[in-house]
């Protein structure tokens, strides 16, 4: 049994306090770092994230980092924010470490094991080891009662009468018999809906009581200014967020992104497929150059690009300078007052031919 953690402190990002729903609101940490309200933030630990491709308004994010006394980064790659760090702890890759059990309860429940194929190379360490050692040095050893990753995993597996050896004998995956989602609710007579009425609520009294509109109302977005397009972004089946663009095999499959432009709009601008342009948003932020993909598969008032490209980190030798970064062009965002979520498709760009 772990000891209770600290309680009572107001969350600086407003999650579950300023915002009625939402586990975290990362972009809302930026202003408290700068203003010191509701309390000063002096240090930041960045684990497995490319900060400059994650949080909107990059200039504001950099201003926040300049206010901090200490930045610790833990990663497997020399990401764009790494040069801003005071200390960098290189983590072992997924092939060199244990990770937590992957447990899914869906139609076919299963438990899967990820264990190292080789020992960690160079001076890298697994993330669990870093957390435990840092906790021990801070006098928090009671929160880390396990000496090894195997000990922790065996403790978890013991709740269902398994251990690592048994799991390995089954190929690293335990598949259990599933059951219909509603079976447990039907057996007890309970409702599957976690609402005050235990029914589907189209009208929310909880939202009304908190001062929000109890029924969703459509709020139109601003239209693009003359000469601009709404910036849309999305994912690629080849890459994972902004983390895999430097991976040799994946880089070979998709070395850079392209900007989708409606073919009629491209014709009007005198642009041809494959021609390279810079993107400049409504606040003057730029990214590129990026190749044009003229296509009928997008609205005439929008452009689209795959997220995760346009890296500035020299250590990312393959990805460095390839394509454009949608994150650099997201200097504005719309804040959802209920969840704290950030709507990022409220930025507009114009296309400037590369000279």
Map each language-model feature to its residues.
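Long, contiguous, secondary-structure-rich segments that constitute the structural scaffold
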Residues: 117, 121, 125-172, 244-260, ...
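Extended redox/cofactor-interaction regions of prokaryotic respiratory oxidoreductases
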Residues: 1-83, 93-103, 109, 173-269, ...
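Glycine/threonine-rich phosphate-binding loop and adjacent beta-strand/alpha-helix elements that clamp
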Residues: 95-120, 130, 135-137
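Short flexible/disordered coil segments
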Residues: 107-110, 216, 221-226, 291-294, ...
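Catalytic, metal-anchored helix/loop core of enzyme active sites in primary metabolism
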Residues: 86
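Catalytic alpha/beta core of large soluble enzyme barrels
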Residues: 89-90
């Amino acid at each position: 049994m772990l000891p209770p953690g600290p309680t009572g402190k107001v969350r600086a990002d407003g999650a579950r306090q300023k915002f009625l729903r939402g586990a975290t609101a990362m972009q809302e940490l930026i202003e408290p770092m700068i203003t010191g309200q509701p309390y000063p933030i002096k240090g930041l630990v960045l684990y497995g994230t490319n900060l400059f491709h994650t949080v909107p308004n990059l200039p504001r994010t950099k201003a926040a980092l300049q206010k901090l006394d200490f930045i610790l980064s833990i990663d497997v790659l020399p990401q764009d924010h790494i040069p801003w760090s005071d200390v960098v702890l290189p983590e072992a890759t997924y092939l060199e470490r244990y990770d937590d059990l992957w447990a899914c309860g869906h139609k076919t429940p299963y438990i899967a094991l990820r264990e190292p194929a080789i020992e960690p190379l160079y001076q890298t360490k697994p993330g669990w080891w870093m957390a435990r050692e840092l906790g021990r040095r801070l006098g928090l050893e009671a929160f880390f009662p396990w000496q090894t990753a195997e000990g922790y995993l065996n403790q978890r597996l013991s709740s269902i009468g398994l251990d690592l050896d048994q799991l390995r004998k089954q190929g690293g995956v335990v598949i259990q018999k599933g059951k219909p989602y509603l079976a447990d609710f039907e057996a007890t007579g309970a409702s599957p809906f976690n609402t005050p009425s235990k029914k589907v609520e189209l009208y929310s009294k909880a939202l009304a009581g908190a001062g929000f509109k109890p029924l969703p109302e459509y709020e139109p977005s601003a239209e693009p200014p003359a000469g601009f397009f709404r910036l849309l972004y999305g994912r690629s089946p080849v890459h994972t967020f902004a983390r895999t663009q430097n991976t040799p095999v994946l880089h070979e499959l998709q070395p850079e992104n392209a900007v989708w432009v409606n073919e009629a709009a491209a014709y009007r601008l005198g642009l041809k497929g494959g021609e390279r342009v810079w993107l400049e948003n409504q606040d003057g932020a730029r990214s590129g150059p990026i190749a044009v993909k003229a296509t009928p598969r997008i609205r005439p008032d929008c452009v689209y690009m795959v997220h995760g490209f346009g890296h500035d980190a020299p250590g990312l030798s393959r990805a460095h300078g390839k394509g454009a970064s949608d994150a650099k062009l997201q200097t504005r965002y719309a804040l959802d007052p209920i969840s704290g979520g950030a709507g990022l498709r409220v930025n507009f760009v114009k296309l400037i031919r590369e000279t």
